[in-house]
Amino acid sequence: LRSALDCAYWDLFGKLENKSFLELNSIETQQLPESSITISVAPIEEQLQKITKSDWNKFKVKWNHYDEKALDLLLKCEKEIALDANGSFSISECQQLEENPLSVQFTYIEQPMKTGISNYSHLNASKFANWMADEDCQEQTKLSDLKSHYKTINIKLVKTGGLTPALELIKEARANDFKIMIGCMTESTVGISAGA
């Protein structure tokens, strides 16, 4: 509800001022943001079939467990692939991934383990894997605590409380040299368009 009200405020303010959100916040857009399509959890053969049939060139593939064979197949598919582990990897599986030079081929690997410092403290941002914090990055999260473990954060308007707190989180993320993705959950097209 908080996110919906905040986004509605910015929409109304923009209409009253006859300016876009970007103009109101002096945000430069020299480069258009890129997007990807999400491939749901399924056997790897089905996921690869969806990737092959798609006109998209960037994909986020969702997993619910670690699978070495599937990992190799994704690395060989010659597409831009990001991996969303949904917190399903173990510490040893994450350590194996971050030591593997081929891990750099994944755009990012999102929320590899269950949330909490007891898990993400085992991730090393200076190694090969581009770890992305999702559930580990909430509105109240101190990004400086994540810095040595994650390279990228996923900012979702619904979990941050709207555009206003998201702007603050983006400023803090940039100050800490994080890469940033604006993600979504199960919002309507109206909710998703606010993030775009």
What are these regions (language model features)?
Residues 5, 9-13, 166, 191-195:
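Buried hydrophobic packing segments
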Residues 1-81, 86-95:
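N-terminal capping/lid subdomain adjacent to the active-site entrance of alpha/beta enzymes
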Residues 61, 66-194:
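Catalytic core of soluble alpha/beta enzymes
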